[in-house]
Each structure stands twice: as C-alpha cells, then as structure tokens.
Amino acid sequence: MDHIRNFSIIAHIDHGKSTLADRIIQICGGLSDREMEAQVLDSMDLERERGITIKAQTAALSYRARDGKLYNLNMIDTPGHVDFSYEVSRSLSACEGALLVVDASQGVEAQTVANCYTAIELGVEVVPVLNKIDLPAANPENAIAEIEDVIGIDAADATPCSAKTGMGVEDVLEALIAKVPPPKGDAGQPLQALIIDSWFDNYVGVVMLVRIVNGTLRPKDRIRLMATGAEYPVEHVGVFTPKSKNLESLSAGQVGFIIAGIKELTAAKVGDTVTTVKNAAPEPLPGFKEVKPQVFAGLYPVEANQYDALRESLEKLKLNDASLMYEPEVSQALGFGFRCGFLGLLHMEIVQERLEREFDMDLITTAPTVVYEVVQRDGTTIMVENPAKMPDPSKIEEVREPIVTVNLYMPQDYVGSVITLCTQKRGVQINMQYHGRQVQLTYEIPMGEIVLDFFDRLKSVSRGYASMDYEFKEYRASDVVKVDMLINGDKVDALSVIVHRSQSQYRGREVASKMREIIPRQMYDVAIQATIGAHIIARENIKALRKNVLAKCYGGDITRKKKLLEKQKEGKKRMKQVGSVEIPQEAFLAILRVEDK
C-alpha cells in the first residue's frame, strides 16, 4: 500500500494536461514508443479535436523513484469543463493527490480554480506544477504568486517543467511521491469500490472503472451495486496501463476495471459503490448523487425515416453517457423526434456532434429550455419542460421558473462587468466577499437565463478568469411568457421560446428578422410573425420572387401587359394557398444563437 500513489491532473483547457499525461506515461514505460501518440488518454476523436477531455481515463504505471523503490502510480485523467463537474468530483474523490498544472505564461484560470476548490474540499493533496516554462513568455514568479493568491495553497516549491520537451517531468513525479500520501484502506475489510466512470464495450458489456477503497475483489466474486441493488458475477478485473491488462485481484488502494457482464450502463451509475454479496459493506461511500439534466432540447432527424436510427444512436450514446436522458416527442413542424435532457450546453453540443459524427445523423435541434412549474386557473400544477406544452395564457394562474444560486469567483478587476452581466440576466445579488485579490459574488439567477449563453458571456466579460458553479434553489413565480413564431399564419412549434416578458418584444423582433434573412424567398409573399397568445408583437415580410412576364412584350397595348400581370397575380395567390414554406436547418441554428443583448 505504501508504494501506491493515486493522483489526477487538474488544469484549465490548453494548459497542457494531456501532454503532461503523455510524458508521464512515456517515462514510466506504459506504452512502447510505437504505440505512443499525442494525447493517448483522449480516446474520442471529438476530445482530440476540441482539445478537451470528456470521459475520465486511467493509467496504472510503475515508476522507479530516485530512492530506488518501485512505486505504482495510478493516474486518473479528469474532464475540466463545468458541465462535467460531477465527473470531476468523482475522479478526484478516487485520488489522494492532484497535480495542479498551471501554464507559466498565462497564470491561474477559472476552471483550474473551480476544480482545485473541489479537490481541496475533498481533502486531496494539491501539488502545484508550472508547465510550459520553455516558452519565452513564461513568467513563473507571477504564476506562483497567483496560485498562492487565488487558490491559497503554498506554491513556493512548485515544480517547473515543460511537458512538451519533457524537461522536469521526473521532478514532478518525485514531488508527487514525496507530497501525496499513500491510500488508506484495508484489504481485509468488506469490499467498497467507488465507480469513477463506466462505459460500454461491444464485446464485454459495461466496463466499470473503480477505485478500491476497502477490501479485495477477484474474478468469480458476486458483486452488488448499492444504488440499484443489482447483483452480477465478476468476469475480469485488471488495470489500464493505458492498454487493458487482466489481473488476479484488485485490492484496497488500487484503481482498475471490473467487467461483470452488465448490459445496461444505467445499472453502473458513476459515483455508486460496488460491494460483494457475501460479506457486504454496511453502507455505501459518501458523495453519490443522481445527476439531473438541467437543460432540455428537442432533437429531430432531418429525414423522417431516420427516426429509428436516431433512437438506436441515442441508445448507444446512453450506453456511454449515463447523464443523457431522452423521451420521444412529436412536433408539427419537425415530425417525430426526442426530447433530450443534458447537463449543460457543452454536453448538449458534444452529444449532438457525436450523433452527427459517429452515427452519421442529420439533426435539427430546438432551443434549449429549462423546466417551468405552471399553476393553472383550475388549481392544478404541471411541469413544462417544452415550450410547445405551455398552456394558453388565459388558462395560466402563474408560472414559476427555477432559480439557481450562482457562486462566482473572479479577480477584482472584473467585478463591475460581471455584476452588469448578472443584472442583465435578472440576477439578484445575495452576497459579495473579498478574499485578497479574488472576489466571491453570490447571485440568484433564473436558470433559463443561464442555459442560453451565460457561461460564454461570463467568460468573455472576465477574459476567462471568472469561474462559476451553480445549484438549484427553488421555483419562484415570475412573469414569463411563451413567444410563438408564425409563418403565413401557421405556428412553427419548434421555434417557440419561453422568455421573460421584458425581453419578449426584443426576442420576437430578433428572431423574426433573423428568419427573414435565412428563409429563402418563395414564389409568393411570406409573412413572419411573433406572437404572445393572440397578441402579435413583431412582423417581417419576405417579398416574393417573380418572373418578368413582360419580357416578351414589345410595345403594344397596356391592357396586354395588365392581362399578363393579373394572370401572374392569380397564380401567386393560388400558390400561397397550397404552398408550404420549408424552413432550412440553418434557420433553427441561427435562432438558437439570438443573444439577449
């Protein structure tokens, strides 16, 4: 046990987390040079392309330290984005230490701070590392001062290294061994293992990535998952050295995988505790919570006959992403599709992109919404997570929207612009505290304002330094209305949005003018209207395309021309009655991007 070190790497996007991981794997000889490639642990194409880590990955490495002893290092690579903060907290709770990687040229950034606070709360030993010191712009003194100032941990002995060139990486490992405590736990106790992550493999079913806290697990043991109570026989256990390698047993302190012929990923919930049926653990490990989707959107296939394929693709994605929820829904404008729940906007984009890329789906996505509580005149209360299901305004007594408590951390230079942003988003300030140069702001903001683009706007007004985390507080009565879009008098249900009354006029006008730019001109006039109930708040017209029917007339009587023009007019009128306007895919996407100015 004394020679095991479990650690993860915390870093902001692009501070060199995956490159450092590559170097560590190379030094410890986890892969031969032939198998070595950039970003070994980011196995999804999408992860490589966006340069982000989505799923947690692990590598069990052995390293002979300078004191001559052989240490087992278990590296758990964590995602860094706020949408995946639950995944981060579970990866961290499986470790005793974390390498805090800070770009020496950029200093501390927001997501580093958020994840670092999570680590400190979980009692993880944080080891600061300055990366990219080979850059001419590197300023290690400033970065050290920032770590001490912002995060408040002692960084005087932060290890400088450059993951790209490989210099100093061994010093990082030495610092890790010196500072991070070995895992606690007793191999003789009943089994308790924390599920860090789980994914579906086409050959063996669900693979669970676990950290054994107490006890020992061998193949042929029967295990029970404590959140669901389901029982399975264990087929294989082992570790990843990034390649998988079967072992005889996994015991306390180790990080490895369990394969137990589980067919459904929903059975192996991330954060759940695994124990054995015989000699079961009395209680599960703390910190497990069901992940609730925060953002809903409709996903529809562009071709109606792709509906079954979309359902299969969602099922397959669900195998690897337990936080994705979906249920079938029908829209008049878009046909059959699914209402999906996501953790946040990045999660939504990633799911969409994976559907398009890995499963060749063509998708239409509706605007993201949150769940509203609607009290009707007859006294019943319904939950509305889809604008199309919002009752008529005449039947509504009041609408309550979800309010979240948002904690924001930022350097004091940006306080003004962040406060302005929160006020625009109808936020109410609850608290404000100064910690050195850092400021903590607490706001109550309607969730509907946050899902649209709050995070991106926050990052841009604070140059990426502000970090936020939010939790649901309550439902609160609010003056929100549903804005419907009509095209030639027909309601397009997929374009309905629920907004606050103060923004409804603006929003309606914006969407209408956006649609006017995007919908191609037809052979007849098209009227675009935005309405609240029966009240029209904005209108745009798309003028008809017309053929020049007079081109063939030379001279001659005016009545001849009039006859041709009248005939054209008649035809247009007839067309308008039978014609339907196709809304191109871009229109939906553009409408999602109508920002609240």
Curated annotation (Swiss-Prot):
EC number: 3.6.5.n1
Binding site for GTP: 14-19, 131-134
Cystines in this chain: none
Predominant cellular place of this UniProt entry's protein: membrane
One Pfam family this sequence matches: EFG_C
Classification via PANTHER family: TRANSLATION FACTOR GUF1 HOMOLOG, CHLOROPLASTIC, TRANSLATION FACTOR GUF1-RELATED
Cited HAMAP family: LepA
The protein's name in its UniProt record: Elongation factor 4
Organism: Paraburkholderia phymatum (strain DSM 17167 / CIP 108236 / LMG 21445 / STM815)
Gene name in the database record: lepA
